[in-house]
């Protein structure tokens, strides 16, 4: 899901420029992973009742040219906010950041988030800290992500970077001009399946859902596609009957989508599908045969070891008996010779 707003990127300074340093002024695009959004929502649900918003740190990756930032994970940072001042536990933030970077060396600090769409002086203070030199993202801009979590309303997400404003250096420390940047919540097939499974539990009273098997997931996907096709067909019929206004953009999109469909006869598709099913069955049969053969081989090897141990024990006992018999006969012969010598004497 991408933001549909339009943006104008202008070259801008990102903070007090030090001698010999050059800030990044390239356009920026933000990519957000779903797990980062879930982490922010979980933090918002666990906040104190008297807190209007909570804040935290954004971690992720940045492209080599710095024009794209991918937000992958977050962690909460404690803060206290009143009408007059704001206090942020920066020591905790630094320690947690060091631990996260040690566990995930490929990730870097990219910015911070807040569960409120409001931008105020305190937002500028926190933004200047995250975008500063040393412990901040300098020379890259810090991304400020706002996620509105107001009950009963849809979740709204916005992404910003900042440019310094202020007449004096003292005023520039708590001032910043927030510039909206385009963002995209990007997810793959695995994340999409997980999101669909989670969303299916929202209408249940116990807030629980069952995990679908691969066949059930495929069936649901096919049903969704058939529903989309029916909805598009009804729209096209209503446009043809002049019951709905025509849209050139939508018509072009449908034309491009139909152009992606392969030009294959239904009989060929059925034949290829049946061949694929046969191949799958053959592979499954061979796998079961190999597994049975391995189990049989293991059992035969175990039986041979058991029989070999029993026969070896019997043979060793017989050999000990023979040695004992020989020892007995030798002793008897020596006694007879000793008796004969005594008789001659």
From Swiss-Prot:
Q: Which Pfam families match?
A: JAB (PF01398), MitMem_reg (PF13012)
Protein known as: Eukaryotic translation initiation factor 3 subunit F
Q: Where is the MPN domain?
A: 30-166
Compartments reported by the entry: Cytoplasm
Q: Could you tell me the superkingdom of the organism this chain comes from?
A: Eukaryota
Q: Could you tell me which PANTHER family the record lists for this protein?
A: EUKARYOTIC TRANSLATION INITIATION FACTOR 3 SUBUNIT F (PTHR10540:SF6), EUKARYOTIC TRANSLATION INITIATION FACTOR 3 SUBUNIT F-RELATED (PTHR10540)
Q: Which Gene3D superfamilies match?
A: Cytidine Deaminase, domain 2
* Record GO cellular component, one term: eukaryotic 43S preinitiation complex
**An MF annotation (GO) of this entry:** translation initiation factor activity
Subunit structure, briefly?
Answer: Component of the eukaryotic translation initiation factor 3 (eIF-3) complex.
Q: Which family does it belong to?
A: Belongs to the eIF-3 subunit F family.
């Amino acid at each position: 899901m991408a933001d549909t707003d339009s943006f104008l990127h202008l070259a801008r300074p990102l903070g007090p420029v030090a001698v010999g340093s050059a800030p990044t002024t390239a356009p920026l695009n933000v990519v957000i992973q779903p797990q980062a959004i879930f982490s922010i929502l979980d933090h918002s649900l666990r906040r104190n009742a008297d807190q209007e918003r909570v804040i935290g740190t954004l971690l992720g990756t940045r492209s080599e040219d710095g024009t794209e930032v991918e937000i992958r994970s977050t962690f909460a940072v404690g803060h206290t906010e009143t009408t007059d001042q704001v206090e942020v536990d920066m020591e905790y933030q630094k320690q947690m950041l060091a631990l996260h970077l040690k566990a995930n060396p490929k990730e870097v600090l990219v910015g911070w988030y807040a569960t409120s769409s409001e931008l105020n002086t305190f937002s500028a203070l926190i933004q200047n800290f995250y975008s500063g030199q040393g412990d901040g993202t300098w020379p890259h801009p810090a991304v400020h992500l706002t996620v509105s979590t107001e009950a009963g309303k849809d979740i709204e997400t916005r992404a910003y970077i900042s440019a310094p404003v202020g007449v004096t250096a003292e005023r520039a420390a708590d001032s910043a001009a927030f510039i909206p940047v385009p963002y995209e919540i990007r997810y793959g097939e695995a994340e999409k399946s997980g999101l669909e499974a989670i969303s299916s539990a929202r209408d249940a009273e116990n807030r629980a859902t069952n995990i679908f098997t691969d066949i059930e997931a495929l069936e649901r996907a096919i049903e969704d596609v058939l529903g989309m096709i029916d909805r598009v067909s009804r729209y096209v019929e209503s446009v043809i009957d002049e019951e709905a206004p025509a849209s050139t953009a939508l018509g072009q999109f449908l034309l491009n989508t139909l152009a992606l469909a392969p030009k294959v006869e239904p009989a060929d598709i059925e034949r290829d599908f049946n061949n694929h099913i046969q191949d799958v069955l053959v592979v499954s049969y061979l796998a079961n045969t190999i597994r049975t053969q391995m189990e049989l081989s293991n059992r035969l090897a175990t039986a041979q070891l058991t029989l070999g141990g029993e026969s070896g024990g019997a043979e060793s006992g017989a050999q000990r008996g023979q040695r004992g018999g020989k020892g007995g006969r030798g002793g008897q012969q020596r006694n007879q010779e000793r008796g004969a010598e005594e008789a001659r004497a």
